[in-house]
């Protein structure tokens, strides 16, 4: 039994979110929540919310026992990038890339 949760268009870069996702892949959900709770990264809070949603989906939709759930899959794909302009000296301008990502978490029982 698998349950899935997604956060699309998360306002963090995929590269930064993957650092957090790699830490919880394959862990028991309770241990994964602990790791995310004490991580100082902004992406950890986003991934934690998606993991909590996946756990709730498993319990409500599939009737799964929370104590037996593990993080089966977690992956982060790139979302669209918003391009902005930052004015600089002497009439120049720099491009600012505001990146987004799609975070997906799949939990399954052993």
Curated annotation (Swiss-Prot):
It holds the Pfam family Ribosomal_L22. It comes from the Bacteria. GO terms for cellular component: cytosolic large ribosomal subunit. PROSITE patterns: RIBOSOMAL_L22. One of its GO terms (molecular function) is rRNA binding. Keywords: Ribonucleoprotein, Ribosomal protein, RNA-binding, rRNA-binding. GO terms for biological process: translation. Belongs to the universal ribosomal protein uL22 family. Part of the 50S ribosomal subunit. This protein binds specifically to 23S rRNA; its binding is stimulated by other ribosomal proteins, e.g. L4, L17, and L20. It is important during the early stages of 50S assembly. It makes multiple contacts with different domains of the 23S rRNA in the assembled 50S subunit and ribosome. The globular domain of the protein is located near the polypeptide exit tunnel on the outside of the subunit, while an extended beta-hairpin is found that lines the wall of the exit tunnel in the center of the 70S ribosome. PANTHER family: CHLOROPLAST 50S RIBOSOMAL PROTEIN L22-RELATED, LARGE RIBOSOMAL SUBUNIT PROTEIN UL22M. HAMAP family: Ribosomal_uL22_B. This is Large ribosomal subunit protein uL22. It comes from Alteromonas mediterranea (strain DSM 17117 / CIP 110805 / LMG 28347 / Deep ecotype). The gene is rplV.
């Amino acid at each position: 039994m698998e349950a899935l949760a997604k956060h699309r268009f998360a306002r963090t870069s995929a590269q930064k979110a993957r650092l957090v996702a790699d830490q919880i892949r394959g862990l028991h959900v309770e241990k994964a929540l602990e790791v995310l709770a004490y991580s100082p990264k902004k992406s950890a809070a986003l991934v934690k919310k998606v993991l909590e949603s996946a756990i709730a989906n498993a319990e409500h939709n599939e009737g799964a026992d929370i104590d037996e759930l593990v993080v089966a899959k977690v992956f982060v794909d790139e979302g669209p990038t918003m391009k902005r302009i930052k004015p600089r000296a002497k009439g120049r301008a720099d491009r600012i890339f505001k990146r987004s990502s799609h975070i997906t978490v799949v939990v399954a029982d052993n």
